């Protein structure tokens, strides 16, 4: 039955009989043809999607990158997470279907005045570039592997410093990503506020104070407990998911640049080594506005 001779004979018999049947049953034949075409198109589309993981030629993806499973780059989100401890929590909190995690070790270098030809000397910057599929200084975003890039750092002053350095990196060396609206800053809470069984979160001190007053006004009998997170690593996976990573519940601030705005001038004043005097004067003038 499985011999070559029998296969040739049976194939010819089936082909002739099936061709005759198709000629006599045109509607059914049309349906079968449409199914075959749809399946072929699905296979072709699937083959194209697989290329998402192979967009980058050359270096392999960073070993610390925990990638998502979606084959659609537009749906993917890359979280650049401060610290390996927080990176572990983020991996457990993420939706593996479309959220990828790249933990960053320590404080990223100040790249504001670093030439584009030298910026990849930083291992962390190199990992970011490879994970993104975009080279620093390039206007070509065809290889971009994610629709959103989310900076996720601690909510305290140290975390804000790291987030500022990452924003500077994108403004200086990945500006087309910013102009395309691809870069976001995640806003994790600094406080957890419990009143009975109710749980609330606050981004900063002003929001915490306002929320505590509102809760006291509504219910004076139930004790209010306030917990300050020391860092992202102190949050468990469920807390990180519901406050920072879950679409619809999280807060993201889009990093934007517009013609005529002063974003670059402000970052230059904050990070340029040559402008220490300008920084000193700015701190003397604006330092009272800081919440410390």
Please identify what each model-predicted range represents.
Residues 7, 11, 58, 77, ...:
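Active-site-proximal structural scaffolding
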Residues 69-94, 156-165, 230-245:
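Conserved phosphate/anionic-ligand binding catalytic regions in large, soluble enzymes, centered on
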Residues 75-76, 147-149, 174, 227-229:
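A generic hydrophobic-helix recognition signal that picks specific residues
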Residues 85-87, 92-198:
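Conserved structured catalytic cores and adjacent interaction surfaces
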């Amino acid at each position: 039955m499985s011999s070559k001779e029998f296969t040739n004979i049976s194939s010819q018999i089936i082909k002739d009989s099936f061709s005759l049947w198709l000629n006599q049953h045109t509607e059914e034949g049309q349906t079968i043809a449409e199914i075959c075409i749809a399946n072929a198109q699905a296979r072709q589309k699937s083959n194209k999607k697989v290329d998402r993981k192979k967009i980058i030629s050359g270096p392999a993806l960073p070993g610390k990158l925990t990638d998502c499973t979606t084959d659609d780059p537009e749906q993917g989100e890359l979280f650049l997470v401060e610290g390996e401890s927080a990176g572990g929590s983020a991996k457990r909190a993420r939706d593996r279907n479309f959220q990828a995690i790249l933990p960053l070790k320590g404080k990223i270098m100040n790249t504001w005045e670093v030439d584009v030809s030298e910026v990849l000397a930083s291992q962390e910057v190199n990992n970011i570039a490879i994970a993104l599929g975009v080279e620093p200084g390039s206007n070509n975003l065809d290889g971009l592997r994610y629709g959103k890039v989310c900076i996720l750092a601690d909510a305290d002053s140290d975390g804000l410093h790291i987030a500022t350095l990452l924003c500077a990196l994108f403004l200086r060396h990945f500006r087309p990503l910013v102009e395309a609206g691809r870069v976001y800053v995640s806003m994790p809470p600094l406080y957890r506020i419990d009143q009975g069984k109710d749980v609330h979160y606050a981004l900063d001190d002003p929001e915490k104070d306002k929320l505590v007053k509102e809760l006291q006004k509504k219910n004076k009998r139930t004790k209010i407990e306030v917990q300050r997170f020391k860092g992202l690593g102190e949050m468990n996976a469920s807390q990180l998911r519901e406050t920072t990573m879950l679409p619809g519940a999280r807060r993201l601030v889009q990093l934007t640049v517009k013609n005529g705005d002063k974003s670059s001038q402000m970052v230059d004043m904050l990070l340029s080594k040559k402008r220490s005097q300008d920084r000193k004067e700015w701190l003397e003038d604006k330092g009272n506005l800081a919440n410390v």
